[in-house]
Amino acid sequence: VLITTYNFKVEEFVPDRIKVNARLDQEQLKPGNTTQLLIDALNYYGPPAANRNYELEVQVKEKTFAPQAYPQFDFAISNRSSFFDKVVRQGKTDAGGKAVESWQVPALYANMGLLQARFFATVFDENGRPVSRNTTAAIQTQPVMLGIGAVGNSYYALNQPARFPLIALNTAEKEA
């Protein structure tokens, strides 16, 4: 007696052969600062992943500064164009399965608000299969963030004064 049937698919699963850790020596950066990404690759159940190809990719994007204590204020810089280059570097791990890459925050990122750098480290096993890890760092491009408050009106009469609340906060979200 057949009660029911069920269709299913079987996929081949190949676990990662190496373990990759990536960490930065700094979590907070400023324009002109240099940080180092430390990559550590180990073979599972074996020695360090020596002489393996790796790739580092650094992406910088805008990060929203939105303090919870001041939800009525907008801290965005709205009339600027974003231009963040993607950095890609390649190399080989040393005999201990380690690699170190330095990256300097460009000085031209000054006064661009709050940014975030994301570091993608990819190490390739002996068959060329990638194993990736990422880590992030905040880039504080200015010591004080200026916010303009919402007043609820989107239309103001011609030649009439309009009042807008302003606030200056440091990056710790305290009044400057």
Tell where the protein language model's regions lie, with residue ranges.
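A structural signal for beta-strand and strand-to-loop patches characteristic of beta-rich domains
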Residues: 1-176
